[in-house]
Structures are given as structure tokens and as C-alpha cells.
Amino acid sequence: MSTIEKHTQIVKKTASKLGFDYCGIAEATFLEEEAPKLENWLNKNYHGKMAYMANHFDKRLDPRKLVEGAKSVVSLMFNYYPQQNLDESRNALKIAKYAYGEDYHFVIKDKLKEFLKCLKEEIGEVHGRVFVDSAPVMERQWAVKAGLGWKGKNSLLLNKSSGSFFFLAELIIDLPLIYDNPSDKDYCGTCTRCVDACPTDAILQDNLIDGSKCISYLTIELKEAIPDDFKGKMENWVFGCDICQDVCPWNRFSKPHKEEAFLPHADLEKSAWEEMTKETFNKVFKRSALKRTKWEGFQRNIHFVKNEAS
């Protein structure tokens, strides 16, 4: 076995040992085909008020600008599909499944740090950085290049065996490895279930999302008042949205995760969120992704969906 084969085997085994469901590897190169797509998306203001999306254009397209001497992008998938959904009846306030438990940034980042540590212990001098939705990395595009799946019409990564309820993460390292074949087939075909189900018409042609219309954007990223145009369209989502994933036929293959940290927080079972004080919110959701919207944003979302129903 060659050194490069041995190193690749160590990477794949370490990913499995740390609980990652899928691991693929791509060469760290410039994403030339993505440059015009990203530029077009930004020029059409599909990023809404997310000004940071226009920053670090070159770094988004070239991992070697993030990690000096980068040779490989290790793409990872970690399942978060719950054992049981929280109350999603018609009048229940709803939050995205990824926010049921602890903040994935903390949980996955800890695993990634351990990953890099393991590589250094087994291989020796390995330099790199770890990423989980926290830097200008085009994670879905890298996952496709690493053979983990294809980009669906809802722009999410779809895996033929397991669907889309996964966190994506990356290690960008200066270690040459054996690269996986990229996914070159789109298995969505003529299906338009996600497009048809989106209540705000955020899903466009060519696997594009108008982020400024997406319920996840409106309830998390948007810091000002939610425009009245969206009244009657939120379907009681107060943090994120899973509609386009819930209707996707590929998610019939989703299996419950085994990560204790992602089990629902006890207070998520309660329905009196609109009466929650700022102090209680900060205490209860200290390690939750819900804190991203802050108490003020959470209350804004609740009042918006409550008022749109009246």
C-alpha cells in the first residue's frame, strides 16, 4: 500500500470512528465553474441582507486562499434527522429539526478538532483548518465534488441513500490524498415537489434559491421586521423551515441520528414560547442554534406568525 493510500484510509477510518456518516475527498482547487454562478446570485440580490455573502469572493472559490498549501478538501456529512418530530400540527409553532438539540457548530466543531488531532497523531505533520458553516466555504459544491451527493432543486445536498437531513463539514488540509469521483448525475429528474411546496416561492430554476424569500432567512438572518408580503405564508415556522426537505422523496430514506447532543431540549416541548422572558431564553438556549436569532428575533417571529393567523 502506498503512502497516499494509507493516509486516505486513515482519513476515512477516522471519519467513521468519530461518527460521521459519509466522508468524501476532493482536490483543493479553484472552483472555476462556480464563479459566474455565485456572481450572478449576488448580482440579483438573492442574498438579501446577508452582506457577508458578498465578502471574500476569492476565498469562497479557492480553499488554498483559506489554508496555505492546501491539497485536499475532506467533506463530511453528519446526520441530524430526529427520532421523533416535535409537534408539527397545524397550529403548533415550528422550528427546523437541526435546532432541536445543541448548537451543531459546537458539537461538530469539537469532532473536527478531534479529527485533525487524530490525523496528526497517526500521520505526523498535517496542517489545516476545520469548518462547519462558519467560514467562506462552498460546502455543498465540495460535497458534490467529493462524490457525496448532488445539489437538489432546493439547493441542498441530496444523498441517494440517506436524503438531505445532514450537517456538512470540511477539513482543508495540506495532505495529498486519493480523490473520490465527483457526483455527476442529478437524480431529482422532473420532480418539483420542493418547488411546489415552498409557500414563499423561494425556490427558483437551476437549483437556485432566492434567499431573501426563504423562511429560514426571514426567521434567522433578517434582523429587521419581516415584510408584510409574507403574511399568511410562514406556516407557523418561527426558526428555520423544513418544508422543502419534508416533501422530498429522497428523505423517505432518512434514518434517526444517534447523537445524544442533538436530542430535543426539554424546553422545546413547551408551547408558551411567546411568554418566555429574555433571561429564560438566554439560559434555556445558551447552547442552542436558536440563540442565533436572539430573544428579540424569536419573539418577532412568534408575533408575526400569530398575527398572520388572526
From Swiss-Prot:
Job of this protein: Catalyzes the conversion of epoxyqueuosine (oQ) to queuosine (Q), which is a hypermodified base found in the wobble positions of tRNA(Asp), tRNA(Asn), tRNA(His) and tRNA(Tyr).
GO molecular function annotations of the record: 4 iron, 4 sulfur cluster binding; epoxyqueuosine reductase activity; metal ion binding
Database matches in Gene3D superfamilies: 3.30.70.20
Predominant subcellular localization, coarse grouping: cytoplasm
Superkingdom: Bacteria
Keyword flag Flavoprotein: no
Domain 4Fe-4S ferredoxin-type: 179-208
Residues that hold [4Fe-4S] cluster 2 according to the record: 198, 214, 241, 244
Active-site residues annotated for this sequence: 133 (proton donor)
Gene Ontology CC: cytoplasm
Record protein name field: Epoxyqueuosine reductase
Self-association state and partner proteins as the record states: Monomer.
EC number(s) stated in the UniProt entry for this protein: 1.17.99.6
Listed NCBIfam families: tRNA epoxyqueuosine(34) reductase QueG
Gene designation per UniProt: queG
